[in-house]
Design a protein with these regions (language model features):
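Extended, low-hydrophobicity segments enriched in charged/polar residues
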Residues: 5-218
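A short, compositionally biased
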Residues: 34-41, 251, 294-297
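Short glycine-/aliphatic-rich beta-strand segments at the starts of folded cytosolic domains
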Residues: 219-234
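Short amphipathic alpha-helix segments
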Residues: 235-248
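Short beta-strand
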Residues: 255-259
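Alpha-helical oligomerization segments
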Residues: 260-334
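Non-Sec secretion/translocation targeting segments of pathogen effectors
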Residues: 327, 331-367
Length: 367
């Protein structure tokens, strides 16, 4: 089956796999530019009871067909995912034009700037090294995912605020809307194993996690996971300097590995790993395990807790050189100021000496 035939089959048959209330729904498939300028086909099934509808991207489901899955099984899976994200009531989307109404719902999303040139054309964004920070309105959040609206230049013009104000507002909202967690890899793996233990042995999650932790090797963690409660757009958490400082208090200066836009790994700098080794690992993982639409960067970043700065590790020497030049320039400016001050003092003293000196009396001639 060709991909376009698959899309048409889904569009024509999806309602057969949905409840009766979707029988009269309008079914459409639209092409949508997503992260890294990936163009995906999004399925939407619109009903009269709700003014919004989930978008289900069909591209990954076709991969299942290519792997031998039956079309009916894939359609049933799409229908199940759709229903889990479906909202059965209207949402006041007109509020998105009023900054005061949506300011406490704004969140950040971190993406690669170069890979998103088309996507960024009509979006306000901030820059961090080779990354771009875009802003979204979090309309809804469930255990299955989130519903967001990306802020465009048109929306931004109506808000009447600066980009800096938008960025600050999004950072303020992060811990409320997307609470973060920072855990060692041992604990993270144990939690994954605990799910299977709880199901297979019919025990509670707390007991299952305790059992899983006993299976973990008794060695210190050298790798940590930064995540949030939705497991979506996790990389944006590193934008918050309070979070970075919290991590640094536990592990010191650290490397940040952008596993994807949804996952971030933290490795202490004193763990003995070189950034070039880590960068090679990131690049290999991106090429073999991360979907193109979820890749963030091929580079490794590091955090200087003393300076409160996050920067690309391959630019560390350049950064150090620039800081040294700035220090030299400041020293030079100070030296010039000191010399000028010394000359000024000398002139003042010289003038003061002239004003207070007593002129010598002329001798009278004796005739």
């Amino acid at each position: 089956m060709e991909y376009r035939d698959f899309v048409e089959q889904v569009k024509e048959q999806i309602q057969d796999f949905l409840p009766e209330k979707f029988a009269d729904a309008a079914v459409e498939v639209n092409q949508i530019v997503k992260n890294n300028d990936c163009v995906l086909d999004g399925l939407m099934v619109r009903t009269e009871e709700s003014n919004i509808a989930p978008t289900i991207y069909l591209n990954p489901y076709f991969e299942q067909i290519q792997d031998g899955a039956e079309l009916d099984d894939v359609l049933a899976q799409i229908a199940s995912v759709y229903q889990s994200h479906y909202i059965d009531h209207d949402i006041d989307v007109s509020a998105v034009t009023d900054f005061d109404k949506i300011k406490e719902k704004i969140v950040c999303k971190l993406i690669n700037e170069e890979a998103n040139q088309q996507f960024l054309q009509d979006k306000p964004y901030s820059k961090l090294e080779d990354l771009a920070v875009v802003y979204q309105i979090l309309m809804d959040k469930t255990g299955e995912g989130t519903a967001t609206i990306t802020i465009t230049d048109n929306l931004m013009d109506g808000y009447g605020i600066t980009l800096e104000e938008l960025h600050d507002q999004a950072l303020q909202n992060m811990d409320t809307l997307q609470p973060h967690s920072f855990k060692g890899m041992n604990e993270t793996v144990a939690e994954m194993i605990a799910v299977d233990i709880a199901r297979e042995q019919n025990v509670g999650m707390d007991e299952a996690k305790e059992m899983a932790m006993q299976m973990m090797p008794d060695i210190p963690d050298t790798m940590f996971v930064l995540t949030n409660d939705t497991k979506v757009n996790v990389a944006a958490a590193i934008l918050n300097d309070d979070i970075r400082q919290e991590i640094a208090e536990k592990v010191g200066d650290f490397y940040m590995l952008p596993s994807s836009i949804h996952e971030t790994l933290i490795i202490p700098k004193d763990a003995g790993m070189e950034f070039k080794e880590l960068e090679q690992m990131v690049q290999e993982v991106n090429q073999t395990q991360v979907a193109p639409g979820e890749r963030l960067s091929d580079h490794v970043y590091e955090y200087d807790a003393k300076e409160h700065e996050l920067f690309r590790s391959d630019r560390a020497e350049e950064r150090a050189k620039q800081k040294e030049e700035k220090r030299d320039n400041r020293h030079e400016r100070v030296s010039v100021k000191e010399k000028l001050a010394e000359k000024k003092d000398a002139v003042i003293k010289m003038n003061a000496g002239k004003e207070h000196s007593v002129p010598e009396k002329k001798k009278e001639a004796v005739i």
